[in-house]
Amino acid sequence: FCLKDTDRVFGAHRSHSHILSLDISLHAFFSEILGRANGLSKGLGGSMHMWDKKNGFHGSVPIVSGTVPIALGSAFAAKLDGNKDIAISYMGDSAMEEGVVHETLNLASLMQLPIVFIVENNMFGSHMHISERQSSYSTARYADANNIKKIIVDGNDIIQVINAINLLSN
């Protein structure tokens, strides 16, 4: 794929697809959801608190945008270490309404950190259509505001997603 074993992925509050995109054990994944001790987080994390450090998945939390600044810290550490690792930060369109996301985007751009932000825009959040919450359907405008390279793709097309991550992480 497009990630190295040492890259780090930070999921959002609905991150089953994020962790399933990595080289994880499906048995351990489903065991976690069922609360079994042989799960990814020993059955203690459940669906919204998955963690698999061995495969580069550094967590998901039920707090909208909760892992975004943590991913930024990971990217900062990679830059300080001088390696070529990147952080992947997943979030939904509602996360774009959180102040911490704007602070993170600004700092990532200012410091030229090795991070790729993936915004899954399904046009709904908090039971509201995006038109009732934001002045534009496009969450990509926040990348423009922070001078961050962006690529808009159909998230259901895995080849487009892989190509976009490859382009943005190089």
Protein language model features and the residues they cover:
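Cofactor-binding active-site loop characterized by glycine-rich and histidine/acidic residues
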Residues: 1-111, 129-135, 140-147
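Residue-level marker for buried hydrophobic side chains located in beta-strands
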Residues: 90, 117-118
